[in-house]
């Protein structure tokens, strides 16, 4: 076999069209230019070989490409970090918002799976609340196109990313080549994820009201949260963006092991540019015993939320947590199809520490 044949045999596969389209959009953002709807349509048509009217691409493809473009732009933009002062961060995110067209049209997949990309500003805030340290392992159970994960990479953490949508998994593998990427039903992440994966941090924005097994169900987000919590290593921290109707007291009562709620913030209109005016909750939970009451607030003031996040208690035994969070030493990279197995029967759980939740 010739050298050229050998080289050809080991060529990297071509990136999916959504990734190449996203890269062009990211380069526009990096050049300081705004992206209009017509710009997105033109770029998508160029890279998908035709227009959406001809069936070459769909609204969901365009949304994924635009979201991935922001992720790629943020990866390359060193001036914004998790430690960036609030005034600089606010200015940056306002500028970015002005250069991105809103998602006023929702795709069938978004509606079906309740998939809304986390806005960059809220993603930055949630990741800042994690108190990340280099080399620890972070799990994101419903990673989407990577808007939360990008901040974890900037902090130097290792990533275990799970996403059930094949399109969004393509985005993740394009943007996070060093990450372990799987395709499980995140409602069963504790049962389906490799047992050797023990994250010290979980960062998540789960679907709120649609599950694979049950269809539309207002407690879907709670089951995603519980499964991720059960996989979190002792002493770890979980930061979640949940729906306003999430029953915090019920979760705390049934949580396995020690649990301390650090923050319960109702965030108003955070997803407006993503097609919904829903109020969400930013929750911070530590897997430790504590008698302290959480900070509880309802606001749409970004600076106020940052102040609360910066005042969070330090994570327990950070060095020990970094040492115990693990990935399999030589785990192969693979995409795992979503499971259709029945949900496991509820298990007997240890009653959590009693915590008073402030009324919101």
List where the protein language model places each region:
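Class I S-adenosyl-L-methionine
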Residues: 4-172
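Short, conserved SAM-binding/catalytic segment
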Residues: 170-180
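Conserved proline-anchored active-site loop of SAM-dependent methyltransferases
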Residues: 123-133, 137-154, 161-165, 184-217, ...
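Long, low-complexity, intrinsically disordered segments
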Residues: 349-360
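Flexible, glycine-/basic-rich loop-and-beta segments that form/coincide
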Residues: 272-335
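Conserved beta-strand segments of alpha/beta enzyme cores
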Residues: 158, 179-182, 259-262
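Short hydrophobic short-linear motifs embedded
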Residues: 6-8, 327, 333, 357
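Conserved Class I SAM-dependent methyltransferase catalytic core
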Residues: 126, 162, 166, 215-285
